[in-house]
Amino acid sequence: MGRFDGKVVIVTGAARGQGEAEARLFASEGAKVVLADVLDTEGQAVAADIGANARYVHLDVSNEAEWQAAIAATKDFGGRLDALVNNAAIIWPSAIEDTSLEAYMMVINVNQVGCFLGMKTAMPLLKESGGGSIVNISSIDGIASKNGLISYTASKFAIRGMTKTAAMEWGRFGIRVNSVHPGGVNTVMGNPINDPILETMPYQQQAIQRIGYPNEIAAAVAFLASADASYITGTELVVDGGWLTGRLEPGLPGSSATTEGFGYNA
């Protein structure tokens, strides 16, 4: 018996990376999964590999009409909806003064507007199905910012806030809404040049000194979508290896990288 036997789940951005891992995990635990993306060739291949319990739909998450079509396809496929994972996202690093309005809005439309439209259009079918769960993928950059990520950070902070508003409004319908805040993840977005050095080097000052992997984020998402999290809503689940917890200082005791310095010896 799987946690999602008889359940129907939509995952956006499911053609590869983190979204693919989420879709595969839901399917492995018994769910019918609708994989939504704009990468049609990749998405269709993943759905075919999962098998009869998966269906691929083309979805530009910034397009309301395409969302409505995706929800209709989901109802046709599974007859209901139990969970939505708003995973689709893009990133466009640039300094504020070098960011055009067009580039800024491109990220906002996918990340923030896409999440809004997903919640809005999925809610009636979730309600009709007796309630369910929405998991919105934010980021550690929706809690603490970085330079060069003005549009991405704005969108991820917005997702954090929208999640709480939706949780407040829809709890009466049995719909829980939570956000997941990954740190670095070994995907095309998190490690775009697929360099093994980037799996460890940037993370030497966090508690778990490596990049995260898609299956680790998927596990957190599945938990929040499941009955195991039945009394959890409006919350933020940080999955970042301790990035936001603090920084290991090599000049102080308690680090494997401790060196002579600050009056301390290794």
PLM regions and their residue ranges:
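Residue(s) in the substrate-gating loop at a strand-loop-helix junction
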Residues: 139
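Active-site helix of classical SDR
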Residues: 119, 155, 163
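Substrate-binding pocket helix/loop in short-chain dehydrogenase/reductase
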Residues: 95-96, 103-105, 202
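Canonical Rossmann dinucleotide-binding motif of NAD(H)/NADP(H)-dependent dehydrogenases/reductases
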Residues: 2-34, 166
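C-terminal helical subdomain
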Residues: 179, 200-232, 239-241, 266
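Short, small/polar-rich loop/turn modules that mediate ligand/substrate recognition or access, typified
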Residues: 85, 171, 176, 232-234
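Alpha-helical segment proximal to the catalytic Tyr-Lys
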Residues: 124, 168-169, 230
